[in-house]
Amino acid sequence: MGIFSIANQHIRFAVKLATAIVLALFVGFHFQLETPRWAVLTAAIVAAGPAFAAGGEPYSGAIRYRGFLRIIGTFIGCIAGLVIIIAMIRAPLLMILVCCIWAGFCTWISSLVRIENSYAWGLAGYTALIIVITIQPEPLLTPQFAVERCSEIVIGIVCAIMADLLFSPRSIKQEVDRELESLLVAQYQLMQLCIKHGDGEVVDKAWGDLVRRTTALQGMRSNLNMESSRWARANRRLKAINTLSLTLITQSCETYLIQNTRPELITDTFREFFDTPVETAQDVHKQLKRLRRVIAWTGERETPVTIYSWVAAATRYQLLKRGVISNTKINATEEEILQGEPEVKVESAERHHAMVNFWRTTLSCILGTLFWLWTGWTSGSGAMVMIAVVTSLAMRLPNPRMVAIDFIYGTLAALPLGLLYFLVIIPNTQQSMLLLCISLAVLGFFLGIEVQKRRLGSMGALASTINIIVLDNPMTFHFSQFLDSALGQIVGCVLAFTVILLVRDKSRDRTGRVLLNQFVSAAVSAMTTNVARRKENHLPALYQQLFLLMNKFPGDLPKFRLALTMIIAHQRLRDAPIPINEDLSAFHRQMRRTADHVISARSDDKRRRYFGQLLEELEIYQEKLRIWQAPPQVTEPVHRLAGMLHKYQHALTDS
């Protein structure tokens, strides 16, 4: 496909984006808004953002959800801006500096919350800065400006949503149904690989792919939940399926690890059974029916616990899968499965990374302020706004540098494109609203196609072009003002990019170590006799951390294996019949405190000391288990955990 070719699947969204822009433009001028540009810009960003992220037309609900987040972020930013102005109106420089810190604070929060919700906090940060900078000539008009800005943004969001509904957005439901079928087959094939106990790298690749696919299915569940309330039952089932899928991965990998030391546990009966190849979900269904009969015949005691648990989880998965596909009423059996253990939320391992993002945003905004005050440039304020926008939005993404480059390319492309509209097209459409709408629709259509291709600079070009062409009421054509705005955007993006390069993010290794220590803490916390604590579902949180580890350290198999081993240890110890007595309970609390100290230690020396203390406590704990005559189901997992921690103590403690 050529660089300028138009694929059929890209046309519908391009028309949708053009419609959103035209609607916002028409409504903005019809209601005599002072700056309809904000409504048009909002409609374009809300519609195009999800398409750029998805690499195609976004699924139903994505644009509505992004619009909802934009409204929340705008209102938070407007309120913060008003509070800052009221408190510091007599000290303008201090007011701007506090706004820079506010933008950094919002970026810090957006780095810690869920990626889906971080957009609202990023927006809140630079909205306050925009308000404070814009009202500098006339501070008494602050409330009016804040209200107008909120109104224009809400109009833009409503127009984007109307355009989305008008062109029947894609439903993700069919994709979810297909993935559920395919995922079950992949789970069965992983168990086959683990029982064969073949090449470790093949197994690593298989379970790594399944972790990614399960995480992707969880993202599809979020999209389905946003799409319509009629999928509420399917959403509940999919939430439980996420845990079941992770359980299947864990049991399969434990089956593989068990055979490293005790291959005789997997009998020839099960080896022969899992030799049968499967291609479809129907094949898996037949095999599971046969497998349940084999287990009933051999007995639970003669069946390896990992295979028994795997079959139970796969059976529940099948039952819930049928419910998701049909979206029927939840029956009593399903309700029993759905009334599972409460999920545990873990503390973010990226606090240092979030602090780096705070300083990047704050310093870049302060640098923009100094540049503005030093040069006295009329478009210094525009440069500051772009600095805040780039840093606030770039910091929450995995590769901030590439986002900044995208904005630089976009603002550079916007200069000639905006020049064409400013000098030729818009002046010649002054007498006709229809011609003005058509001209902007053409812009939205072609940039909408490029956005779906994820062309570098396409998203920045769309926003920057709309921002610099004259869409005010009334329209005024001052070339110097246009040139200042265009150059201000470019300078702001370059300054933001410079700060991102200078303030290096070296938090990757620290984040990896914190993640590994959180896995250790989770395994240690599973050693408890507290009934409520044993019922807590840590599995989704643990695999979410594993997924983050896989993204931070692609290809680092030793780290992945260590993390997976800790997850397996957690699951095994969680179900182990630990003797109930006060002596062991007190020691469990002591070990949990020590594990928490390992995570929170600021220096390597403290971390090594606490880790050594944890290893000593595990030795004492094993002796206590022997004294209290704990069964092998308890002593063996604890012994394996202690051995793993001894083996990898340097990786878990050194920076």
UniProtKB/Swiss-Prot annotation:
Pfam families: FUSC. The chain crosses the membrane at residues 13-33, 38-58, 69-89, 93-113, 121-141, 152-172, 370-390, 407-427, 431-451, 459-479, 482-502. The keyword tRNA-binding does not apply. One of its GO terms (molecular function) is transmembrane transporter activity. Induction: Positively coregulated with aaeA and aaeX by AaeR. It is a multi-pass membrane protein. One of its GO terms (cellular component) is plasma membrane. It comes from the Bacteria. The keyword Transmembrane helix applies. InterPro entries: PHBA_efflux_AaeB/fusaric-R, PHBA_efflux_pump_AaeB. It is found in: Cell inner membrane. One of its GO terms (biological process) is carboxylic acid transport. Signal peptide: none annotated. Keywords: Cell inner membrane, Cell membrane, Membrane, Transmembrane, Transmembrane helix, Transport. Forms an efflux pump with AaeA. Could function as a metabolic relief valve, allowing to eliminate certain compounds when they accumulate to high levels in the cell. HAMAP family: AaeB (MF_01545). Belongs to the aromatic acid exporter ArAE (TC 2.A.85) family. This is p-hydroxybenzoic acid efflux pump subunit AaeB. It comes from Escherichia coli O81 (strain ED1a). The lineage of its organism: Bacteria, Pseudomonadati, Pseudomonadota, Gammaproteobacteria, Enterobacterales.
